[in-house]
Amino acid sequence: MHIDDILKDQKPTLSFEFFPPKTSEASEALYTTIGELEAYKPSFVSVTYGAGGSTRELTHDLVVRIKKTTTLDPVPHLTCVCHSEGDVASILARYAEAGVSNILALGGDPPKNLAGYDRAKDAFQHAADLVAFIKKFNEGGGHADKRGFGIGVAGFPEGHPTTPNRVIEMEHLKAKVDAGADYICTQLFFDNHDFYDFRARCRLAGIHVPIIAGIMPITSASGMRRMAELAAGARYPAKLLRAIQRCGNDEDAVQKVGIHYATEQCLDLLDHGVDGIHFYTLNKSHATREIYASLGIHDSAALRKAS
């Protein structure tokens, strides 16, 4: 089912992100997490794609396994970096064959320590180019669904790390939507005002597709530093930093504060009519399950009944 159809039928949506594990032990842990979170009936789940396509097969295998062995609707990430048109066409054909309905099209991170890599030589310079290529694939009839793949793209409430000019940033996002994107899923943020401002600027720019908010609960002090790296410099509000500092070296307290803060974010987002919330789980279920409990719901469908 296309995500834009899900958003029409199930708003507000709740969904989860996983990343492909690289060891057998991590795989077993992830499948346990997936089993625990499947009971919460997410609208969809996404699966990340490593820098420079480094997890191409791992991502594919996880997506296909989720598709075949669970009731979940997987959405694979796909990036521009280090891919030829032939590479992307092959990846899309394999996902179409597996019955995958959606793709999240991203610019992607450059590969680390790859000698001689020149970004200018990539077939897809921007995510909008990748969106346009997927749209062309759809029009070629390569998918059992006559509409082809549903297409999502990323948004950055705190600003894109490589595009400090907010006007140009919004032009790039508009280009992705004009190329065929159905919805936007945002990078994580910790100040909801950043999201509301981003959403308002999108509407002013003529971007009217649904916008899903990305939320990642803090579960450890060290995890905060890692989050900032993953999000290319996430901004932590002073009130959150003060709450974390009061915990000192008590990691259990840090986790409780982080989950409470994320829950308050979710409640506020829901009160402000958010289209959906996407939880960055880091392949763990505890924080997400605690947020559901604090929201007073046992699964995603219960949230829609209460809305």
Give the location of each predicted region.
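Active-site-adjacent beta->alpha loops and helix N-cap segments on the catalytic face
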Residues: 3-6, 26-28, 53-65, 84-90, ...
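Conserved, mostly hydrophobic/aromatic
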Residues: 17, 45, 95, 176, ...
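Short, acidic/polar
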Residues: 24-37, 59, 85-92, 164-175, ...
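N-terminal amphipathic alpha-helix/helix-capping segment at the start of soluble metabolic enzymes
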Residues: 1-16, 23, 139-149, 300-307
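Catalytic cores of alpha/beta
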Residues: 83-96, 168-172, 197-203, 220-226, ...
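Active-site mouth loops of central-metabolism enzymes
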Residues: 13-29, 74-86, 150-168, 245-260
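Active-site pocket-lining/capping segments in soluble small-molecule metabolic enzymes
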Residues: 122-145, 153-162, 204-259, 264, ...
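Conserved N-terminal beta1-alpha1 strand-loop-helix module at the mouth
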Residues: 1-47
